[in-house]
């Protein structure tokens, strides 16, 4: 547990300087040029954050890759020597008439022994080459694994630090969802491009160069002829790289937009489901996915055509080379004394070099994707904001006096430059003075507070503190002098203790007693003490485990613990009940003494003791003075106060005594309930826990089954939906795999024909005919490989991209389907869920698309290769197959180890995603608390586990990958050894020499065909081994994906089941409702509540924060089901009703209204039930009813004005009015108002309240309100205390009762 966040330091993350991943972004930004403007960075820029150790690893990896690339074609030199060992063409013209048969038999034995000895020596050379290649492969895999993991962590941290650094103006143009999805997708793609795939690029390039170098050294003119088509191949490679990068960049931009939609909705599921907007958001997400699919399919087509063309040109070059090779052997070429072995070396080395180009598609694709992703990430990292919270520049005064002055301040929001918010504002606040800002919503009050914090800079004029322009002060010092409580308090997903401690100044360590004292001042200590875990209670995401009032009290305690010189209170008590408000208000007034305090409030009773009250109107101060002065003036302020007043006068002392009496009575009842709780609650709680656990297990009962055959499910999913593409791709993959084994048969036959030629003897007609036919066959194979490569790569890639897009759609849709309790669980926090949504489908490419095509191609190549080997020499094939299981075990061990390694890393990245989302979504709160370093360190701590795994897993994974190469090479060497041994064993030595050599050559030809087929099969298995790491990670991602897809929530918003009925009246009834949250089964929230709201009646729920009011509304919306009891709509149990039908009858306005990052009109239209059409005029009418039409129309773009991420571009009151309009456009039978007017100013509240009263006519309305003036006209008021209804009746009945409600009403309003 972190007792004091201010004690953490940035440097505490790294235990080893060798793994330091926290360079100073300022220094890096100065040292490195910014990326180019073409949507991708250069390779040099890609590695811009590499340190000394990283460059050592990069160089080591490149050396290893180059060694592996060079040594593989060099093995062809050994193959050529083997070929020359069997060359008997020089013996064809020898005269054997004078040699006895016994001597010829002796010659047979000598020839066989000589060949066997030579082969054995060459086999040893092959082993040596294999060892060298294996060392190179180990070095490549180890270095690039460690390098990519280190760089991935480093870039993640730099990107997160850059996000924490950016100012509010920048965030106004960027949705938080877009930014947070980048770290899950873009950084992973950068890491992927820096991984072993980058090493494979060097390996293939060096293999290409080495192959041609060997060719030139052995027979330069033959190599030159083969190279005649190289320019065409280079053009193809350039074409491939350019278009792959272009389409990748466009696709990734659309992916970021989709990520923003996902985060906005997943983070606000209550709003989405209450509006029944699951399908609409899913459709919007699907449109972004369709855009991605378009670009990725274009990329797939480019890759398929490009690689097919490369292989066609390669085959064409070999056909041309075969024809010219026959001339060289006959001495008619520029090079002389070229044997068949030399021609084979040239052919095989150039073939291997050219085939390496075919393998370049995957690393080029990964690299181009990484370069495009790096461009987007590095742009953010490079940006140094104008308001830089990390800057050490600026004045740091020795003390802060607290004199604030705004001189002719003009301000416009960056996203609305044509809309003036403040127009020449002049305001001076002296040390220790309390100034209240009042006025209509959107008039500039909260903007003024943001300018004092320097969240923004004014566009004209200046803001000064103690005579210093804020722009001249050190920003961190400035914000450390300020304590802020905002209108929508933000808590972080940690304990209550940590949340309060986050308010402490840098370098200060408040004691436990000081923290508790601040909680008491905020009237929070009592409710915290009643929580099972007390101050160690986790508050959930954005404080979701607490009520609005509880959150606000903790936020107040957080501000008080800072002991600030300046206190900013922006509607600090708006979410508090009357009882708490009075206590907290007194605490705030006490805390304000000696401090400069600025208060923004709509409840004017909270500002009457201010030294000065400033009345704002359209960005200007139209009245200012004390409360009494403004009341005497009888102008705007006077009218506002009158509208909030009641016509009763009370004795405040009596009220205080009554409140004290009720609190003591409540505590006494609680103490008396302890004995009963001890006797019965334990058994009850255990039963409830068991029941809730069983319900959760029922929802997830299919998950274990889904994980068993997840690989098969992905493949079948792909084939079922894209059967035509998959079928054609399957045929293409089988065909492409068959081409090279059959090509090798023709090639060996060609070599045998060439071995029979010599410069001294004219070739026979049959030999020339064979050479011509073989060249034609090779050219036909080239055409075949072009078609089949396009089919298996282009079509499988297209099918794979479609599958990934489809799975993204299904996964997002499944996430929208989950009930609210799913998101209450720690393992399903928004950050984790959005990280999975961004990364898991991308990782699934390891078992789809291109990978499936490559696997089919490989298995086909292996199958045909083994079949051909058995056909030509079954003994050789059988002997080699006997050791093949070793290679199979290594291949699958590689996959298993990669899956094991990726699982904890994935979990760590998901956990870091929670921190990222939490900080970015609440960036203004983070920066106002100067807690950037706290969240940075928290993020760094999340990444410790993958960091530690780097050295643990690097050598193991590299060893297994390198072992794959070694075993493949050993199989080739063993093939030659066993093949020669078998030829030696089965040869008939009692023959004359010439027949013996013919028999020997026939056996050799068959063995050669069998061995080359086996070698191609072994090489294919080796290539399969390089794909296995991605397969392991993809299977893990597939499990996560299908876990969500298979989960059946108990409250299924997609369900078509359930009753519907006509003529809905809207009668709501609670029958003995008991409720516990599934994640907190030990805490009983509602304890047997019963009430009935008849058609057209209004029921008000009042009570202290956390007593269960908002929970009741959530039960009506059926976000949860009651633990016991029933909720009825018109006598129907809502569990039996169709969920969409139920929610379409309800309009809800919440305490903290959520708007989406779209236009005003689109936000209002979100309230329209599915299948209903509304006109713009109806939308305008709803806005007028909510008193929103005038301010919307006054905006430069009117109803088309974008409200920003979570409505950040408009004020709290404006947001709430738009939310009310959104509820009214539904024309609901049941209206749920949870503090619906809490953020409105007095004038707007009166108008909106009248509108709501009018809208409530004919509708059943459930109202939650702390402002009791808003519920005076309710048909029934229920006072909830500790989960039970303590009092009920009309306003007058409860006043006459002179009970708790009466006391609250008198305490709240007092006298005027």
From Swiss-Prot:
Residues 404-643, 1068-1307 form the ABC transporter domain. ATP binds at residues 439-446, 1103-1110. Residues 59-369, 724-1033 form the ABC transmembrane type-1 domain. Keywords: ATP-binding, Glycoprotein, Membrane, Nucleotide-binding, Repeat, Translocase, Transmembrane, Transmembrane helix, Transport. It comes from the Eukaryota. Its EC number is 7.6.2.2. GO terms for molecular function: ABC-type transporter activity; ATP binding; ATP hydrolysis activity; ATPase-coupled transmembrane transporter activity. Glycans are attached at residues 98, 819. CDD domains: ABC_6TM_Pgp_ABCB1_D1_like, ABC_6TM_Pgp_ABCB1_D2_like, ABC_MTABC3_MDL1_MDL2. GO terms for cellular component: membrane. PANTHER family: ATP-DEPENDENT PERMEASE MDL1, MITOCHONDRIAL, ATP-DEPENDENT TRANSLOCASE ABCB1-LIKE. Belongs to the ABC transporter superfamily. ABCB family. Multidrug resistance exporter (TC 3.A.1.201) subfamily. Energy-dependent efflux pump responsible for decreased drug accumulation in multidrug resistance parasites. This is Multidrug resistance protein 3. The lineage of its organism: Eukaryota, Amoebozoa, Evosea, Archamoebae, Mastigamoebida. The gene is MDR3.
